[in-house]
Amino acid sequence: MSELNVTPSSVSPEIVIPKKEKINLLDLNRQQMREFFAGLGEKPFRADQVMKWIYHYCCDDFDEMTDINKVFRNRLKELAEIRAPEVAEEQRSSDGTIKWAIQVGGQQVETVYIPEKDRATLCVSSQVGCALECKFCSTAQQGFNRNLRVSEIIGQVWRAAKIIGATKVIGQRPITNVVMMGMGEPLLNLTNVVPAMEIMLDDFGFGLSKRRVTLSTSGVVPALDKLGDMIDVALAISLHAPNDTIRDEIVPINKKYNIETFLASVSRYIGKSNANQGRVTIEYVMLDHINDSTDNAHELAALLKETPCKINLIPWNPFPGAPYGRSSNSRIDRFSKVLMEYGFTTIVRKTRGDDIDAACGQLAGDVIDRTKRTLKKKMAGEAISVKAL
């Protein structure tokens, strides 16, 4: 906490008076914003006005909020702030993809903007690092430090929109889709991820359709069950294997919550969700001679026969020191054809931003690893918390 130092003219000891920290309005969803404004004696519509300025205009200066009287603007400046994390570095790919290294404290997470003809997708991080230790993912090699705050999650969207152009400034949405597929496991940070997604969906926030906000998870089953009671967004599951033997090796959380348990939880979520239109997205990274044989494809089809889904096959994106290779195009093609013969909608994801290490599985950031224990001790008997770590 910052401090105000008051020193009398005499030689008496310095008196330290704590200075109250300002509320960062990016940490508040609409209900919380209204409660904060009610505490200031203001009606709910005033909170809605401020939210529109923040998210529709990407405004972080109270003086620019011209439909709010000056007296109240000055009061807000004393008590609150609008502070999104800053961009430490920007890289632009030859295919138009942009990667931002976002400063969060003394560390960095990465956010990726992927423009296409009919959409613009933002890939957002939820944690500084990741504790799940998936073997094919660069983020996992960085270790884990902490969860991101609401303001650091929604702040990535705000910062990207500010750079690309706010809705009310350019006349169209700068971001049409958000995917929680950046650094970290979103379900291990529900406390902050859910309010951030609420702001993404809110008409006074970014106003995205619930079908255009996607959360990806590796399978934290208790948290997935909890998610379905908290919010309705599209779901993608990081499966990556047709059986427990392979998944235990490349996605270690499978030793805690195996595929059968994971898919049962997915089914429960689908039953609660409208955003998924009755099906989920299966993410399957293609690792050469690890999980990409035609036998693996037949096994995957049998595994998913009771799970309404579409399947995204993801050519693996290399990073230094990784023990894997990317499946050849011919192996991916054969794998895809087997799945389509079973009637599955199957898409081979186009790699974007790999020349700037912005493709799926390549995000790394700058992480001070706080926990060497991570999943190893958890597998020895500790429960994986569904609360903020």
Swiss-Prot record:
Keywords: 4Fe-4S, Cytoplasm, Disulfide bond, Iron, Iron-sulfur, Metal-binding, Methyltransferase, rRNA processing, S-adenosyl-L-methionine, Transferase, tRNA processing. Its cofactor is [4Fe-4S] cluster. One of its GO terms (cellular component) is cytoplasm. GO terms for biological process: rRNA base methylation; tRNA methylation. Its EC number is 2.1.1.192. Binds 1 [4Fe-4S] cluster. The cluster is coordinated with 3 cysteines and an exchangeable S-adenosyl-L-methionine. It is an enzyme of class 2 (transferase). The active site is at E110, C360. Residues 116-355 form the Radical SAM core domain. [4Fe-4S] cluster binds at C130, C134, C137. The keyword S-adenosyl-L-methionine applies. It comes from the Bacteria. S-adenosyl-L-methionine binds at G184, E185, S216, S238, L239, H240, N317. It is found in: Cytoplasm. It catalyses: adenosine(2503) in 23S rRNA + 2 reduced [2Fe-2S]-[ferredoxin] + 2 S-adenosyl-L-methionine = 2-methyladenosine(2503) in 23S rRNA + 5'-deoxyadenosine + L-methionine + 2 oxidized [2Fe-2S]-[ferredoxin] + S-adenosyl-L-homocysteine; adenosine(37) in tRNA + 2 reduced [2Fe-2S]-[ferredoxin] + 2 S-adenosyl-L-methionine = 2-methyladenosine(37) in tRNA + 5'-deoxyadenosine + L-methionine + 2 oxidized [2Fe-2S]-[ferredoxin] + S-adenosyl-L-homocysteine. GO terms for molecular function: 4 iron, 4 sulfur cluster binding; metal ion binding; rRNA (adenine(2503)-C2-)-methyltransferase activity; rRNA binding; tRNA (adenine(37)-C2)-methyltransferase activity; tRNA binding. Disulfide bonds join C123-C360. Belongs to the radical SAM superfamily. RlmN family. Specifically methylates position 2 of adenine 2503 in 23S rRNA and position 2 of adenine 37 in tRNAs. m2A2503 modification seems to play a crucial role in the proofreading step occurring at the peptidyl transferase center and thus would serve to optimize ribosomal fidelity. This is Dual-specificity RNA methyltransferase RlmN. It comes from Erwinia tasmaniensis (strain DSM 17950 / CFBP 7177 / CIP 109463 / NCPPB 4357 / Et1/99).
